[in-house]
Amino acid sequence: MKILVIGPSWVGDMMMSQSLYRTLQARYPQAIIDVMAPAWCRPLLSRMPEVNEAIPMPLGHGALEIGERRKLGHSLREKRYDRAYVLPNSFKSALVPFFAGIPHRTGWRGEMRYGLLNDVRVLDKEAWPLMVERYVALAYDKGIMRTAQDLPQPLLWPQLQVSEGEKSYTCNQFSLSSERPMIGFCPGAEFGPAKRWPHYHYAELAKQLIDEGYQVVLFGSAKDHEAGNEILAALNIEQQAWCRNLAGETQLDQAVILIAACKAIVTNDSGLMHVAAALNRPLVALYGPSSPDFTPPLSHKARVIRLITGYHKVRKGDAAEGYHQSLIDITPQRVLEELNALLLQEEA
């Protein structure tokens, strides 16, 4: 059986979608699974053994471009896929499998995609509370799976593969010392500072960890580089020698390898949080207005700290810097306690 998956366009969603690929492979061991997704996803997909080929989606996230999608679909016809699974909810994301003439096209209804999909699922958000459950449900016939309780347990969570050789090579590439174990911080998050733990809290935690004998490495995109510099600036000269701001300095694949080399990770609700979970790193995840009830880190080594409940549609925080009060209220001491408990568990 040949399967085409139209993958998501965000790091976190792409990571969670691996649970679907793992489930499909477990159900259909002979299946060949290709994933069409933005080209930047390739470093993640190449580390998922279930994925045969990452096919770059050449069209932008917001572009409809029906003519181009038709051409793209027609170019896939020779691959003779048997099934397609469409993970994004947009109308346009269902066009390529339709134009490719794939006989069985499965997905949630999303933007009224009757016709484009011929195996349409209607989402009951209460029956399927977690994003990962919604992905995995598509691997089964809709008559069988009425709620998340019907899914076989345990779910096959995301797992990325990184070798020891890659870790030492990439640490050397970035001149990261092997003298001290690394703790990774992921201080960025989409949609600005409202989902971010304040930089001054990260700085306070970094001071304590460096004084305890760790080195701290900051990860993120170029957009997070300034937040990293703010953390760095709050440290004294001796401490700065043991804190590296790699936000915007690494390719995604290098960040994956370096996160795998970390002893533990402290992170906001972000795509890199899901990467760290898939690498089975002990991690402390800090949530504010966004809710872990929908997209928690999928790992037994994750601890979530959140001081409020429910979902708050807040793109802007309360404080002058745009931080959300519920994240300001999470103290560095509390995070350090959770982190130390995880590190003790890991050593045991």
Give the residues covered by each predicted segment.
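Catalytic machinery of carbohydrate-active enzymes
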Residues: 1-348
